[in-house]
Each structure stands twice: as structure tokens, then as C-alpha cells.
Amino acid sequence: MKEAKIENIDFGSALSERYLAYALSTIMSRSLPDVRDGLKPVHRRLLYAMLQLRLEPNSGYKKCARVVGDVIGKYHPHGDVAVYDTLVRLAQHFSLRYPLIDGQGNFGSIDGDNAAAMRYTESRMTEICTLLMEDIDKDTVDFRSTYDDSDLEPVIMPASFPNLLANGSEGIAVGMATNIPPHNLHELCDALMHLIDHPKAEISDIMNFIKGPDFPTGGIIIDKSDVITSAYMTGRGSFRVRARWEKEELNYGVYQIVVTEIPYQVQKSKLIEQIAILLKDKKIPLVSNIRDESTDIIRLVIEPRDRSCDPQIVMESLFKLTNLESRIQLNMNVIGSNNVPKVMNILEVLQEFLSHRQNIITRRSTYLLNKIKHRLEILEGLRIAYLNLDEIIKIIREEDEPKAIMMQRFQLTEIQVEAILNTRLRSLRKLEEQEIITEHSNLQKQQAILEEILNNPKELWKVVKKEIKAVQAKFGLNTTIGARRTSFEQVTLTNQVVDITAFITKEPITIICSKMGWVRSLKGHNNDLSSIKYKEGDAEKFILEAYTTDKILIISSEGRFFTLLADNISKGKGTGESIKLLVDIGNNDITEILVYKPDHLLLLASSIGKGFVVNSNEVMAQTKSGKQIMNVPDGHTCIACLPVNGDSVACIGESRKLLVFNIDEIPEMKKGQGVTLQKFKNAKLLDIKIFNREDGLSWNSGGKVKLEKNIIAFLGKRGSTGKLPPMGFPKNNRFS
């Protein structure tokens, strides 16, 4: 038994080498497509296996299990689930712009339903798929050994059409990713032919032909042309895609909105669920109901709250809050013809494809030319055999080694003699000189054409262009599959903020929030609140008079702001609902609740003695998680949020020192810790108040309001310590 060999290797070096090997394997052999055929290895192996099984468009279907078995057994030694998922996606008309596989059976749905098991489904190639492998048997591409050296597989596909851009691709590798949306094949062919005629064309010229992505699910791209062009110039960007909808008139002036197309890669079922949740949470008050009436075509019916609602505004609110508008990323990170990953722009991708087609046609022409030369040589031998038929038959019958004798007697090559000897005697007798001459002449014409293609670059590019033109004619705009599905619109309402409060009846309400964070609203103002009940151990903390159309600001002890629509607060005589169900406030306390007023100033203060002024427009939160405005250190809290309605500020803390200074000394900020309001030593700020100096400083003491007009003794600069408060000031060091 041999002794095991142990080497001392630096762990860091070994780890980095192995990780690099893994990363390269992921990038080159799994996640990124090749710019030439737009396929990843698993796609290439799957389609080649189907070609070997002769699953052509005009043949019968075969079980997907058989296809997957061949793929993982011969070419792709990975899990059957991954291969079947790939097969399913290539057959889904809502995933691929030009499906490469024709599936029979349940291949999933746009709702996100899974496909049936592979033992139930069947498949074959589509017509456009055969273009990817056209002429693969004519030495157009290199082959390599499979993983077990038992067979060969193509390194690349001949690809008669630009599959990378036509069908797009997406994948995540180690440290890089790719995301290429699908495009219209007719437009791509126009761009390629223009590039052949004008090799020095720039991206701006190409954009005259390629308008933008063309998604299998349709939709409307609302980006401006300069934004789209910029994305294609850099190879990175994104496209904003909206659902297509129409207004459907009903009786008595009532209407409904019908969505007929949804953005690419948006699952219909999840979209409906998303809208339903917003309806339940009263986030879209302009909508009363949504229902799915889809069959083979998409039909989502949205009912407005009432017929006076502008359908454009209804849809704007839905676009803002749901996936009816989504952003499709563009990241053209692909493996180039030099086997190096690179983010390419649209021009580079098209040039790479044309170079690939140039190489394919060159190799095909060379292959066919060699075949013709071989056949011409044989025909020349057959013509000699025809002219000397009796003598050749005699040699074949009588001589033991007819090959050498025939080569010497008639000056024939070995190939010619082999062809004659391999021809059956009956066939030799039926040889006709005219047939040989006709075939010889035709082959010479073909030979001249092929030699012209190989020797004249202009002729070669003519062939490339002719074949692209043929693809365009077969799958262009005038065909069912080729017509553009995604359109473009300039949306003027994109940046408009939809004021949903305009559709809420304005009614007075009183908002009540308890110490334990239970919130509710009662109709009207000036209510008698003596009969209000709270949970055991709870009591009132905030009482706020507002209107149903108001937006309510909730400030937490950690300095985070939350925004609620007053109409969404629980109504009735119960204990209400926990604030935690409405906003993600966590275990923090509520510092203040205010009615939002546009362009009003608010003063924020923390227990550490710092604060700043902020505009109310800056604190509006758009999400349930809120917006962090005041940064509070550990061990401290945000103690106050006050409307700025005076010229002076009074501060008092645990040190029982009162400081009064001008409010103009506090800067206005958007967020942060703020500046020092009052200096403390081993103490905290407890309370703060804004007032007008000429009115005097007031506070509550023993249920009575006391007023101090003479506050000169307490005046100081912001950041000072302050002085002891006047006699009778509350012992809890608070103004109220």
C-alpha cells in the first residue's frame, strides 16, 4: 500500500486558488451566455441532444423525460431538475420572445404555476430553433469531448439569427451577473444589414433600427429615447415598463379598467395578490375591487371607487404602488469570442454576431468546396471509366489486383479507382456520359461561386446579408410571431404625485392614542371622552383633532417618522388597533403624534440635549418602515417634536437648570443628531418648549397654568447651562 503524500500549502493560497477555479467554472460553464449564439452550456447541450434525437418541427413529440435523460447522461452531468427547468423555460411563450422548444402538455403559466412532471410532458424543437443549429454538420463549428470522453458536443452553435438579443438572457455568476431583455428580430436584422453596408456605423445609427426591448408579454416602455440610447451605449441601464390598459364603458356612465398586458417577468397571481393587500390596507382608495377574468389572454378588471374618478389617475396610483409598473434591468455581460467575460454595448454585440456568421459561412463554404472538389475528382474518374468501360470491366473480372493496374493503365488517382471499384457492376454499365458531364458542369459552377465567396470579402458579406434577410422574411413584422408586442409612450403623468385624499370625504375626527400604543378614531370634534375605555393598565396619551383627509405624523423615541392616512385609522368604540399593525415602530415608544402640514417647521430634541429644525416635507415617509430623521445615541431617546410657532425656546433637564434662547440659533437640517441645545453634566434633557417671548413663559403646576413674564435671568446662548427655574416651577422639571 502506497504511503499518502502530504504537502504543506499555505491555507490562504489554497483557498484562493480553489475559489478562483470555482468562480471561473461558474462564469464560463454555467451563468453567462456566449455572445455568438446567446446560449449557456446547458441550453446548448439540451438543444443538441434534441437534434440528435431528431426532434425537428415536423417530427413527432418525445417525452421530456427522454430528452432530459439524454442530456444528463451524455452531455450535462447535473441534476435532472435543473435541465428540465431549462427545457420548460425555453418552451414558455411568456418567458421567451421566440420560444426554442414546442411543448405539449402543462408547461406552467404566467401565474407562476409549475410545469407538470417531465414524464407527462412532451417536446420538440421549433422552426426558429433549427436555425440555431443550421449547417452544424458542415464543419461550421468546433466540437469537443463530453465530460466522459464518450461523445462529442459543439463548442458553439452556428446560430443563423441573433439569439442573444432576440431572446435575451439572465444569470448570476460569482462577482458578476447578466441581464439582457429580448428584442424584436425584424429590427435586429435591419440593424445587422445596416452594419454590413456601413461597417463604421455608430450606436446612434443603430438606434434608428432598434427602438428598444420587445417583451413576450407586451407592455409599454415609458422611458425617453435618450435614456434608452444611453443604456445601449454603455451596456448597462434599465427600462421602465408599464401594463397596457384600456377604459371599458358600462351602463349609466359607469366604467371599468381592463389590463390586457402586464410587465415582463411579473407573475399575474402575485400582482393580483399585491393589489388585494393594498385594497385591504386602504392604500388605494381610488379602487374598489379587482378580479381576474383571464383565459388564454390576460384580462384583469379593476373597478374604480366611483365613476367620477379619472381612470388615468387611478392607474397612476396603481403604477406607483404595484408591479403594474416595473423596471427591467439591462446588463450585457457576456462571454466574447475570445472566451473573456465583458460588458458590451449594443454595437459590440452585433459586430460579434456578424463576425461569427462570417466565420461560419467561411467554414461552410470551405467544407462544401472540398466536397465538390472530391466529387469532381470522382466524376472525372467515372468519365474515364465510361470511355473505357469494357476494358475496365475485364480488368475487374480477371485481375486479382485491379486497383494498381487501373491506376497505371488509365492514370487514375486512388480516390477515383476506389469510387469505380465501389460502384456496382450494374451501375457501371448504366453510366451515361451526358449525365456525368452535366453534373460536372453544375459542380464547377458551384465551385466557382464558393471560391468567389472565399476569395472576395464582398461576396462573403453578400451571403451573410442574404441569409439575414431570409430570417427576417420568415420571422419579421408581417408574421404572427414577429410583430412588435411592446410599444413606447411618453408619459406626462409619470412624476405626478396622485393625491388620493381628493377622493376621500372630508369629515372631522378625533384620534386617540393610548400609552400602550393602541390607536383609534372617533367621528367629530369636541367629543366627550370621559366614557372612553382602555385596556387594563392602559390610559390616554395623545388626543388629536383632525380630518379624514389629513396625513398623520407619528414620531418614535428612536427619531423615526411614520406617515398614516387619517382615514385608515381604526374607527369605532373599541380599544382600536395596535400602532404596530400600521407601522413598523418595533418596541419603541411614541414621542409625538401630529397632523402633517406642508412646509411647516418642526423642532426635534433628544435627551442628550441636542436638536435641530426640520421642514415637515422632509419627514414624510412613503413606506410602513418609516423614515429615520433624528439620529439618537444608545441610551438616549427623541423626547420632543414641536411645531415651530414662536420665537424662543425653553429647555430644562435633570440638572434643574432652565435655559431660554432664540429659536433662530437652531439650524434647519434634513436629518442627523443636531446641535447642542443645552449643556449637561451627567444629566439628560427632560423637556423643551417653544413660545413667544413677549407673551412670557408658561407651565402647568398643580393643575394651574402659571406665567412668567420676566425671563431675562434665564436668557442665554444656545448650548449654555442655564439657571435655576423660578419659584413654583414643577419638581418633575417639565412644562406640562
Curated annotation (Swiss-Prot):
Which positions fall inside the Topo IIA-type catalytic domain?
32-496
Q: GO CC annotations?
A: chromosome; cytoplasm; DNA topoisomerase type II (double strand cut, ATP-hydrolyzing) complex; extrinsic component of plasma membrane
Main location (coarse class): membrane
Alphabetically sorted, this entry's keywords are:
Cell membrane, DNA-binding, Isomerase, Membrane, Topoisomerase
Q: What is its EC number?
A: 5.6.2.2
Task: Report the superkingdom from the record.
Answer: Bacteria
How does this protein lie in the membrane? Peripheral membrane protein
Is Chaperone one of the keywords UniProt gives this record?
no
Query: Which InterPro entries does the record cross-reference, listed alphabetically?
Result: GyrA/parC_rep, Gyrase/topoIV_suA_C, Topo_IIA-like_dom_sf, Topo_IIA_A/C_ab, Topo_IIA_A_a_sf, Topo_IIA_dom_A, TopoIV_A_Gneg, Type_II_DNA_Topoisomerases
Catalytic residue list: Y120 (o-(5'-phospho-dna)-tyrosine intermediate)
CDD domains named in the record: TOP4c
Catalysed reaction(s)?
ATP-dependent breakage, passage and rejoining of double-stranded DNA
Q: Does the keyword Isomerase apply?
A: yes
Q: Where is this site: Interaction with DNA?
A: K40, H76, H78
Extract the GO molecular function terms from the UniProt entry. Answer: ATP binding; DNA binding; DNA topoisomerase type II (double strand cut, ATP-hydrolyzing) activity
Q: Where in the cell is it found?
A: Cell membrane
Q: Where is this site: Transition state stabilizer?
A: R119
User: What Pfam families does the record tag this protein with?
Assistant: DNA_gyraseA_C, DNA_topoisoIV
Q: Name one GO biological process term.
A: DNA topological change
Record-linked PANTHER family: DNA GYRASE/TOPOISOMERASE SUBUNIT A (PTHR43493), DNA TOPOISOMERASE 4 SUBUNIT A (PTHR43493:SF1)
Q: Its biological function? A: Topoisomerase IV is essential for chromosome segregation. It relaxes supercoiled DNA. Performs the decatenation events required during the replication of a circular DNA molecule.
Its subunit composition reads:
Heterotetramer composed of ParC and ParE.
**Could you tell me which HAMAP family the record lists for this protein?**
ParC_type1
Family statement drawn from the similarity comment of this UniProt entry: Belongs to the type II topoisomerase GyrA/ParC subunit family. ParC type 1 subfamily.
Put simply, this protein is called DNA topoisomerase 4 subunit A
